[in-house]
């Protein structure tokens, strides 16, 4: 059965109708929920589904308390495939892998080498139950760490790096912790502490289960939607084309599983080739045929996936089997038939229901407990499995505490006594962002995908701008990780300086019309410039990167690749009749062509459209680029033309001032301007940051942003004000207040906070708090996502379902409404702007306008502490040198301080451009330390 592209889009998550008119100013009304009664005795920001606590490691954790089997509030409309309607998930991960832990107790592990995938699918109808749980039996009674567990109580804790489940009943307690050890090891540790609460000695068996049937996030399968295929079933059918092979591991203490590819199903291959031919004959508004010039080693799917293993660390296994079908039998995961007997030692299974099952026998006296430890993971090419197993055998009892200690020592921290919950939120965001890293062996770099619906449902890593934004907070703590993300993106640069919109599978450029985007190189130039300024690592510019795309792919220096990107922006993308950078198929907003114009108009729009956003951003980025090159030793002959482009873009943006705000986009002669009658948030902050707006325009603009975009929303500024611009005529359609038709986007509000921070610190701080998980949980406590993680866009108060995100068929944002890295990265980077931080040629400029009596911004690179005594801080870039610290304070505040110290020595005050300047030696591990006191 086939389905037309029009029907597909008409039924997609972007196809929504009807409008909801809400009050102009945000206030509590019958349509806008107040804090629920269940919230009143919980820490701020807990919401309905549990509460925030401080765990035994002095780290934040979320105690999940909802019984999703009985509570109707747990249900979300989803398309079956990845998450169930009542499934709420938590991320555990390290730099190598990421796993999703379910409120049902199971854990799926994502692994990206070869192609992004779950190593252990959850598809109970196919006999696949993910993993990370087990069964305790004394021959009569059974407890399970798969919810509800057959006990009297079942506790669930989402922690930094771990997922804890504690089930009690039948005279026993099982406390299982699944954690990803901090670092780069491709493994999870499962620690199971079993206690005998009865009055008699107990002979017990524990069976640890991890599945081994893959679920690849295949974009090839996603493309087959156009042929009427179910993407999730297509992916699961593809997994059956692999045969499993098992053998004992580590001297018989565990199991090793490998896979053999049997070839593609010929019928499926014909379907895919038909879809490709269809796109070739009849261009689609979103998808295109695959790039015929893609590298030979690129592939939509992983045809040689890694081996997986499960090992008992603290003692040999008492038994094992790979016969998952025989173990679960007709009782399934709730009542496995195999619990009635010892595991049979069968390692001959090859089918999709094969599994890794280990048994441990133990005898416990009354009141006695024992901890069993297992290691589950996958083999990285060129590494030794036995060495990894030995490492964790030695560290089994201490690995969780050691990992937690590492999490406490890394990352960005911010705290203020006036808002205690902020410290928790910042620590949590850093954890989620860092644990979102994986490793891509096509580019040979760590990468932080946007994830969420894009990776887990649609199957692509993109857009190219997104990992660059996610990496920015690590400038302050882990510059080597930033360099990996930069190298990943630099490797994507094509001979003409463009970048693929996204990557699917193993290095395959995403086949999409959005590949003809205009803005991607801007983000790369900006991110590299920020890296060089923050770390002083000018040598990075002369390091070489292996590019992967185009006939002239090969080694090139970072400096030359940036120049290639700049030429692409200025010569290929170029400018239109209004002097603004052209938009092409899209700028940041992927929907402008497909939602606001008809298919018949699209050719003109792509050729003639211009983006105020692109030019406003280019004015900032090109200026930053020129200054960075000058700092790195470039002469004026190279930078003067770039500075001229800065002025050209500023002038073009200034011409788009309406008297109230800046226009959004020129859609060509037929459609004219967007943004004359409505304010679009996208270009406004960049117009301020890039120097396009003068002082009076800035005041007017901030006032209108506050009134039109901020005051109407309790959870962050909306992207587009109400009005005629919300009328969409294209193939994609979204309801007002949703998606790119006025939703709430953290990635946009990050830039707004940055712009506000230099003008109105109180408004900037308020906007930061409104975009927090804590605020969302207070305003919309019964929407589970948005409490500890969230999507890249939330519905605004102007929508029918405020505080939620978009549903729809055949896929919707509600299908995977968490783990979007923008929700974690953007608040972190915005904090650096709230303290007025700017890296300049001579060092650091700080202009804090936060309305807080005291706060602490602490990172390995840079710190700023405000107290009743004054300010102090440090700066420790990679390169040791004499650096300048400029502290700009309001005159009334500055006059209170007379004592200045640099590296422990008192120095006289020196004013430069209205700021106190302090100069001293620092870097390469010895920080420049300074203080300004009364």
Predicted feature descriptions by range:
Residues 109-168, 172-173, 183, 738-740, ...:
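Non-catalytic C-terminal accessory modules of carbohydrate-active enzymes
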Residues 162-163, 608, 616-617:
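Hydrophobic, small-residue-rich alpha-helical packing segments that form membrane-like cores
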Residues 207-209, 224, 500-501, 617-729, ...:
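Catalytic cores of carbohydrate-active enzymes
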Residues 446-458, 501-519, 548-552, 578-607, ...:
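Carbohydrate-binding/catalytic loop surfaces
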Residues 21-466, 480, 488, 530-534, ...:
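Anionic coordination/interaction segments
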Residues 1-16:
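N-terminal secretory signal peptides and thylakoid transit peptides that target proteins
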Residues 416-435, 442, 477-480, 484, ...:
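Active-site acid/base region of carbohydrate-active enzymes
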Residues 135, 460-467, 471-581, 612-615, ...:
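Aromatic-rich carbohydrate-recognition surfaces in CAZymes
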């Amino acid at each position: 059965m086939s389905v037309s592209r029009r029907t597909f889009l008409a039924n997609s998550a972007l196809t929504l109708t009807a409008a909801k008119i809400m009050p102009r100013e945000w206030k509590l009304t019958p349509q806008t929920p107040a804090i629920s009664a269940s919230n009143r005795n919980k820490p701020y920001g807990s919401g309905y589904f549990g509460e925030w606590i401080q765990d035994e490691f002095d780290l934040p954790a979320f105690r999940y308390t909802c019984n999703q089997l009985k509570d109707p509030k747990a249900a979300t409309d989803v398309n079956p495939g990845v998450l169930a309607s009542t499934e709420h998930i938590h991320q555990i991960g390290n730099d190598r892998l990421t796993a999703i832990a379910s409120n049902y107790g199971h854990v799926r592990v994502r692994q990206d080498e070869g192609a992004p995938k779950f190593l252990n699918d959850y598809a109970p109808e196919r006999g696949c139950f993910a993993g990370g749980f087990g069964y305790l039996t004394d021959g009569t009674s059974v407890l399970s760490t798969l919810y509800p567990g057959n006990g009297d109580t079942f506790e669930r804790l989402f922690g930094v790096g771990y997922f804890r489940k504690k089930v009690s009943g039948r005279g026993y307690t099982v406390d299982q912790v699944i954690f990803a050890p901090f670092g780069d090891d491709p493994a999870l540790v499962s620690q199971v502490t079993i206690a005998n609460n009865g009055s008699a000695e107990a002979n017990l068996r524990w069976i640890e289960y991890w599945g081994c049937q893959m679920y690849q996030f295949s974009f090839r399968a996603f493309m087959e939607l156009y042929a009427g295929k179910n993407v999730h079933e297509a992916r699961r059918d593809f997994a059956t084309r692999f045969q499993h092979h098992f053998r004992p591991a580590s001297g018989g203490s565990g199991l090793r599983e490998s896979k053999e590819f049997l070839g593609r199903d010929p019928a499926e291959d014909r379907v895919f080739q038909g879809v490709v031919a269809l796109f070739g004959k009849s261009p689609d508004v979103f998808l295109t045929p695959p790039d015929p010039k893609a590298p030979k080693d690129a592939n939509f799917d992983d045809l040689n996936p890694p081996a997986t293993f499960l090992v008992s660390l603290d003692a040999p296994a008492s038994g094992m089997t790979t016969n998952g079908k025989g173990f679960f039998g007709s009782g399934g995961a709730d009542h496995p038939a195999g619990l009635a007997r010892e595991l049979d030692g069968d390692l001959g299974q090859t089918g999709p229901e094969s599994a890794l099952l280990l048994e441990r026998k133990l005898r416990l006296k009354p009141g006695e407990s024992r901890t069993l430890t297992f290691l589950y993971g996958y083999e990285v090419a060129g590494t030794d499995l036995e060495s990894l197993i030995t490492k964790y055998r030695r560290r089994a009892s201490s690995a969780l505490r050691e990992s937690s200690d590492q999490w406490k020592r890394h990352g960005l921290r911010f705290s203020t006594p006036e808002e205690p919950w902020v410290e928790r939120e910042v620590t949590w965001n850093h954890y989620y962002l860092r644990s979102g890293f994986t490793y891509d062996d096509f580019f040979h770099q760590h990468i932080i995908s946007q994830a969420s619906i894009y990776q887990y449902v649609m199957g692509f890593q993109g857009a190219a701008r997104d990992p660059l934004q996610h990496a920015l907070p690590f400038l302050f703590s882990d510059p080597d990780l930033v360099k990996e993300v930069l190298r990943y993106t630099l490797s994507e640069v094509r001979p003409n300086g463009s970048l693929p919109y996204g990557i699917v599978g193993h290095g395959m450029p995403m086949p999409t019309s959005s590949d003809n985007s205009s803005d991607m190189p801007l983000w790369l130039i900006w991110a590299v410039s920020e890296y060089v300024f923050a770390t002083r690592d000018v040598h990075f510019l002369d390091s070489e990167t292996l590019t992967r795309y185009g006939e002239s792919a090969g080694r090139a220096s970072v400096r030359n690749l940036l120049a290639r990107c700049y030429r692409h922006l200025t010569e290929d993308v170029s400018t239109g009749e209004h002097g603004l950078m052209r938009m092409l198929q899209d700028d940041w907003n992927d929907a402008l062509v497909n939602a606001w114009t008809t298919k018949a108009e699209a050719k003109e729009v792509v050729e003639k459209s211009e983006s105020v956003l692109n030019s406003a951003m280019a004015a900032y980025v090109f200026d930053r680029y020129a200054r960075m090159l000058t700092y790195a030793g470039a002469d004026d002959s190279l930078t003067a033309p770039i500075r001229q482009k800065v002025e050209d873009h500023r002038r073009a943006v200034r011409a788009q001032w309406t008297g109230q705000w800046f226009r959004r986009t020129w859609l060509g002669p037929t459609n004219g301007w967007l943004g004359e009658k409505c304010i679009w948030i996208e270009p406004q902050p960049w117009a301020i940051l890039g120097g396009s707006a003068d002082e009076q325009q800035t005041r007017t603009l901030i006032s209108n942003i506050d009134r039109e975009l901020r005051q109407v929303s309790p959870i962050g500024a909306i992207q587009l004000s109400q009005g005629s611009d919300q009328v969409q005529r294209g193939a994609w359609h979204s309801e007002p207040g949703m998606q790119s038709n006025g939703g709430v986007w953290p990635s946009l509000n990050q830039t707004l906070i940055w712009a506000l921070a230099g003008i109105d610190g109180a408004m900037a701080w308020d906007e930061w708090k409104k975009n927090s998980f804590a605020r969302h949980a207070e305003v919309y406590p019964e929407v589970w996502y948005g409490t500890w993680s969230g999507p890249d866009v939330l519905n605004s108060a102007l929508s029918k379902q405020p505080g939620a995100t978009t549903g729809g068929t055949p896929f919707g944002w509600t299908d995977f409404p968490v783990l979007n890295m923008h929700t974690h990265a953007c608040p972190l980077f915005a904090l650096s702007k709230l303290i007025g931080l700017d890296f300049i040629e001579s060092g650091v400029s700080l202009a804090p306008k936060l309305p807080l009596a005291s706060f602490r911004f602490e990172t390995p690179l840079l710190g700023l502490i405000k107290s009743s005594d004054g300010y102090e801080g440090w700066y420790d870039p990679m390169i040791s040198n004499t650096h300048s610290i400029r502290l700009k304070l309001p005159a009334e505040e500055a006059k209170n301080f007379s004592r200045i110290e640099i590296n422990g020595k008192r120095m006289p005050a020196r004013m430069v451009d209205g700021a106190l300047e302090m100069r001293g030696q620092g870097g390469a591990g010895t920080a420049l330390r300074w203080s300004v006191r009364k």
